[in-house]
């Protein structure tokens, strides 16, 4: 019998646009934990560093709740990047006009999975 145990981590209102983080998330979805961290460490993007922190948090949650679990048994099951809170600012322009500047944030949800056989 095969039992799935899933462990999650969330990063809320992280200071990067979801449009910039989603292509990075596509690279690690379905990969092993060790390979995902290696891919994220080699990327120079700000979103990769944010995603790396959330993936490490999910893996540490898994290892905390299951003491006989090691890093090579963990896989990245789900990565979701959603819109977060938007901060709107007024940007002064020429001739007394003003534009709106929108700073976008994102929510990152990571779910890691481990599979093990149970005899019985």
UniProtKB/Swiss-Prot annotation:
SUPFAM superfamilies tied to this protein: Ribosomal protein L22
Superkingdom to which the source organism belongs: Bacteria
Q: Which keywords are on file for this protein?
A: Ribonucleoprotein, Ribosomal protein, RNA-binding, rRNA-binding
Q: Which GO terms describe its biological process?
A: translation
Q: Which GO terms describe its molecular function?
A: rRNA binding; structural constituent of ribosome
GO cellular component term, pick one: cytosolic large ribosomal subunit
Pfam families annotated for this entry? Answer: Ribosomal_L22 (PF00237)
Stretches for region Disordered: 1-22
Q: How does it assemble?
A: Part of the 50S ribosomal subunit.
- PANTHER family tied to this protein: CHLOROPLAST 50S RIBOSOMAL PROTEIN L22-RELATED (PTHR13501), LARGE RIBOSOMAL SUBUNIT PROTEIN UL22M (PTHR13501:SF8)
Give the record's family classification: Belongs to the universal ribosomal protein uL22 family.
Instruction: Describe the function of this protein.
Output: This protein binds specifically to 23S rRNA; its binding is stimulated by other ribosomal proteins, e.g. L4, L17, and L20. It is important during the early stages of 50S assembly. It makes multiple contacts with different domains of the 23S rRNA in the assembled 50S subunit and ribosome. The globular domain of the protein is located near the polypeptide exit tunnel on the outside of the subunit, while an extended beta-hairpin is found that lines the wall of the exit tunnel in the center of the 70S ribosome.
Question: Can you name this protein?
Answer: Large ribosomal subunit protein uL22
In its UniProt entry, the species of origin is given as Borreliella burgdorferi (strain ATCC 35210 / DSM 4680 / CIP 102532 / B31)
